[in-house]
Amino acid sequence: MSASVKVSAMNAKTLFALCLVLAPLGCASALPAQTLSEDEILGQAEARIQKYRTGNADLRLLGADGKPLRNGAHVRIEQTQHSFLFGANIFMLNHCKTPAENAAYEKEFSDLLNYATLPFYWWGYETQPGHPNYADTERLAAWCAAHHIVMKGHPLAWNEGQPAWLPADLSDAMRLQMQRITDIVGRFKGEIGIWDVVNEATDFDRDSTRKGGPTLTAGIRQMGVQDYLRTAFARACRANPQSTLVINDYVTSDDYMQKVITQLADETGRPLFDVIGIQCHQHRKDWSPEETWQICERFAKAGEPLHFTEATILSGHQGWELRTGNPQFDWASTGEGEQRQEKDVTQFYTVLFSHPAVQAITWWDLADQGAWQGAPAGLLRADMTPKPAYEALLKLVKGRWWTRTEARVARQGRAQFHGFYGGYKVTAEDHGREIVGTFTFDAKSPQPVEVRLN
């Protein structure tokens, strides 16, 4: 098929699907695919990071009186936040075994991360009909807001389980499922702005879902997966049109693209999602840089941002089967495993941070204590002490990928610097008094960025 197909001869949905097929030919809404070797992926990562994650900022600095700072004034410019979202689920906040461990969990989370995934699993969130656990969410949200941490809710719709009280009638069950989306997104409008709307729809009808969520699974089957997806996302959008809506899946093959992503559009063909979520639990084997890059390239063809929503690299023995038939198996972190985890985590984050389509990485789980599957998945050990992988990430996220610099003010209060995209604090002296201003800066920021210091 030629890339010169006339747009006027097709509807918008066909065009969206065509963009996925023709992405390597340069479809305007998609990134061109790049096939790179491991040496190229890693060797060129720093250059890509500089290209996609940093820029030149032109500031216009004003004092409290609205007048430009004096020519020659010295200013300190310090980053306070990343635009890129470095996150983890926050399920263990206030649920660790001891107060000291709770305090350590809070500190290590807020020291490293700016993004948190909050739990909304229906079967545990609403154990009695009409009584969702909003109070616990409000406590989590208050802590995140106090620490300037962006929040995401996960998941609004997932048929891996279901409330014990869910009606057996399929139409009633699906009506309640959709109403839940409306209620939750509307309730937390202004607090939680990102949502995993539908989880794992590609292979929704599998053994575990038929066992754990039989009514919901049958309801999706009866409704049709496309209508299920469209209705869920339309509900979320109506409840908060400003929210960022994520489709999330563990499937990383073309099936996800063909069965879900290309189908998730309204009647005009406009995509109903804002972000493609990619799970990346590496319990059995760590992904190579080539695998990670290829997955980025595969889904970047859709022309929408990518979030790596559930990232796991173990610091112990690898394999899903280790606890099969032996739930008491001590799946512990090991010294050798921690060294391997440090290396692979560093490579994994470097590759993702260097890819222009990726906007977020969420680690699953921050600590071994309470980790999914009981695996040594954390960046912290069970006692909340940091593993080498945590320390390595901290050196990247708040070190190599973080900006602290100084500048001299030129005429009309202008000052320039080169830095990573995000939030900043600028400090200057005015007649012996320290004055401070804040600003944000990214690739789309209008220049100059005007900053008032007080």
Language model regions located:
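Short Pro-Gly-centered beta-turn/loop motif in secreted/extracellular proteins
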Residues: 98-111, 416-423
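Active-site-proximal loop/turn and secondary-structure-junction residues that shape catalytic pockets
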Residues: 92-94, 122, 157-160, 199-203, ...
